[in-house]
């Protein structure tokens, strides 16, 4: 691995190991990824996949490489590089916010056949004393956006 690749790995994909007070090595990151996804692979196939990633002959989803383990167990959205949704319902906005907060890119369509399904936006707004309480979590922020 050259210096640039090492920097990218350490700064983006290597987990911090608190008990060892350091970040993962490339080999440890690959092991974490392969161990996470490889439980259904025969041993020989798992070894081949591990070697191919170690040697950088192939690259898995980098989002999944970053999040494999507890983070991906908590929320599988974090394993995707990108997603898509049409903007055809108000709920699309909070869904988009949630997916973005998980670190996944979102492509969207605002084509006529989709946006014509949205409710009209009022031309004027009235004063309100409404308070929106936001739970400090990805889900909390997305739900508050819906309010």
Describe the role of every protein-language-model region:
Residues 1-147:
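Extended catalytic cores of very large enzyme megasubunits
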């Amino acid at each position: 691995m050259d210096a640039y690749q090492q920097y990218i790995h350490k700064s983006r994909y290597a987990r911090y190991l608190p008990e060892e007070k350091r970040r993962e090595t490339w080999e440890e990151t690959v092991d974490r990824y392969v161990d996470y996804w490889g439980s259904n692979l025969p041993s020989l196939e798992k070894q081949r996949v591990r070697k191919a990633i170690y040697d950088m002959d192939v690259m898995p989803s980098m989002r999944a490489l970053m999040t494999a383990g507890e983070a991906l167990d908590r929320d599988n959205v974090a394993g995707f590089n990108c997603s898509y949704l049409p903007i055809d319902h108000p709920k699309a906005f909070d869904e988009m916010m949630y997916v973005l907060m998980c670190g996944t890119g979102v492509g969207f369509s605002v084509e006529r056949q989709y946006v014509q399904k949205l409710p009209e936006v009022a031309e004027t707004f009235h004063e309100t004393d409404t308070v929106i309480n936001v739970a400090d979590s990805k889900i909390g922020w997305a739900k508050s956006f819906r309010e």
